[in-house]
Amino acid sequence: MTNTKSNVTKKSLHPRNKHTGNYDFPALIKACAELKPFVETNQYGNESINFSDPQAVKALNKALLAHFYNVPFWDIPQGYLCPPIPGRADYIHNIADLLAITNEGTIPTGKKVKGLDVGVGANCVYLIIGNREYQWSFVGSDIDPQSIKMASFIANNNPSLKGIECRLQKNEENIFKGIIKPTEFFDFTMCNPPFHASEAEATAGTERKQKNLAANKAKKGHAFQEMQNAKALNFGGQKAELWCEGGELAFILKMAQQSREFSLQVQWFTTLISKKENVAELYKELEKIGVKTIKTIEMAQGQKISRFVAWTYQANVNL
């Protein structure tokens, strides 16, 4: 049994992340003119956008994906999760480092490397970044037909994206079964699990984020208009994206249990974990079912610390 936990508190994005430093708004506007109306000069004399405005955040995402990843077409339906691109890129780059561990220290690239994004959502962002940065092939799964439809539309309407397939999970109780085919092998799986245990909890979380953003902007002297729509895009999300019965812990424990059936078809299973206290619970479950190697990888974006846990049933992995 090999267990490792990162004890280093990081303060910056992954060194290969393209989104370090300030946004180059002239370049982003050149890539996506839709961003221009949302860019304004703040009290410090810097160009920025109002991050409390969901349309501004959506336009910024469009520009980032067009400029950095040559993905000119990107959109999401109203009310679906609009993820921050830099943090999503960090997960991908850290997975690349993880794959190097079982590839003689070299990051594997190309279409033969295959990943599964559990809960791809309508935004398709992980698949876009992994495909464009490392040319990996991807399968994205989701229980929401609209998410699959939109993610597939994005993948099929950007010529730069190759080897991306989206599959509908027809049974909400299954995570891998019904998605991973009998003869398929995946180098890794990834997941941003539902955080909340109920819709009421998810709504309360959205409102709390909005209040915190308002307070932070007030401290900095920015004018702030309270968002009336509790499902603002940058804090939005459908049921499958935000909550499930039992919340994050129940979901990741189910993932651990169901991973056993696919131990020979997946090199590395991984999942983000928002609540730090859930890491120990996942470790206990993985050890109980006989996982050989478990690793926790910390990531950071400014003051925000996030993490994902990775595990493999392969023995003798030298971490």
From Swiss-Prot:
On whether rRNA processing is a keyword of this UniProt record, the answer is yes
| Gene3D superfamilies linked to this entry | Vaccinia Virus protein VP39
Which Pfam family, giving just one, matches this sequence? Methyltransf_10
- List the GO molecular function terms: 23S rRNA (adenine(1618)-N(6))-methyltransferase activity
Q: Which GO terms describe its biological process?
A: rRNA base methylation
- Provide the alphabetized UniProt keywords: Cytoplasm, Methyltransferase, rRNA processing, S-adenosyl-L-methionine, Transferase
Q: What is its EC number?
A: 2.1.1.181
Q: Which InterPro entries match?
A: METTL16/RlmF (IPR010286), rRNA_lsu_MeTfrase_F (IPR016909), SAM-dependent_MTases_sf (IPR029063)
Coiled-coil intervals, chain numbering: none
Enzyme class of the recorded protein, top EC level: transferase
Location in or out of the cell: Cytoplasm
This protein's GO cellular component annotations are:
cytoplasm
Catalyzed reaction equations: adenosine(1618) in 23S rRNA + S-adenosyl-L-methionine = N(6)-methyladenosine(1618) in 23S rRNA + S-adenosyl-L-homocysteine + H(+)
Q: Which NCBIfam families match?
A: PRK11727.1 (NF008725)
The record describes the protein's role as: Specifically methylates the adenine in position 1618 of 23S rRNA.
Protein family according to the UniProt entry:
Belongs to the methyltransferase superfamily. METTL16/RlmF family.
Q: PANTHER family from the xrefs? A: RNA N6-ADENOSINE-METHYLTRANSFERASE METTL16, SAM-DEPENDENT METHYLTRANSFERASE
Question: What protein am I looking at?
Answer: Ribosomal RNA large subunit methyltransferase F
